[in-house]
Amino acid sequence: MPFFAQKHIKSAENRLVLGLFSLFLLFLQSCSPPPVLDELTTFENNRWHLDSAITVQWAPEDAEIPVFMGMYVRHLDDYPYNNLYLFRTIRSSQGVEYSDTVNIALADDLGRWNGTGMSTLKTVFAPIGGGAVRFKGDERYTLSIIHGMRDTVLTGIQDVIVKFEQAEN
């Protein structure tokens, strides 16, 4: 068989394998339940003001379903620090249900950015709480997040995504 024919067959095999792999990934994604909550907060000009709280409200549809809570911080490579302090509070009509302070390491000790992303934008995941929780079905909740850095205007943070996902029972 001529060389150019072998190369063409190899290319077709690669496309077939890539196509089958893509279908498999699509199948896996479609099998997972949709997120319970998925909220994006974007900061104008990548500037997060100290007095600008991220506020997310939700009312659980099913109190029997445990939920994993997490957030994604997307920052640019011009962010001036290696870390990000956040104050997070969950309130209900009964008062404060959960409160914490988290120090998210956006870079390692050598200054290399943590997280995923191939360009100037990196994404870092931070869980909220210690595991899956159940919320009361007849209650409305509010999550508030403010940054705890010394800057009045924190530059380099593009957005924060709050995502709650259904846990296995």
Map each language-model feature to its residues.
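C-terminal motif of bacterial Sec signal peptides marking the signal peptidase cleavage site
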Residues: 27-30
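Bacterial signal peptide processing site
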Residues: 32-35
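Post-signal peptide N-terminal segment of mature Sec-exported envelope proteins
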Residues: 39-61
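Short amphipathic, basic-aromatic surface patches that mediate peripheral association
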Residues: 71-78
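Short coil-to-beta strand junction motifs in C2/discoidin
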Residues: 80-86, 156-158
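Internal, hydrophobic beta-strand segments that form the core of beta-sheet-rich folds
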Residues: 135-151, 156-166
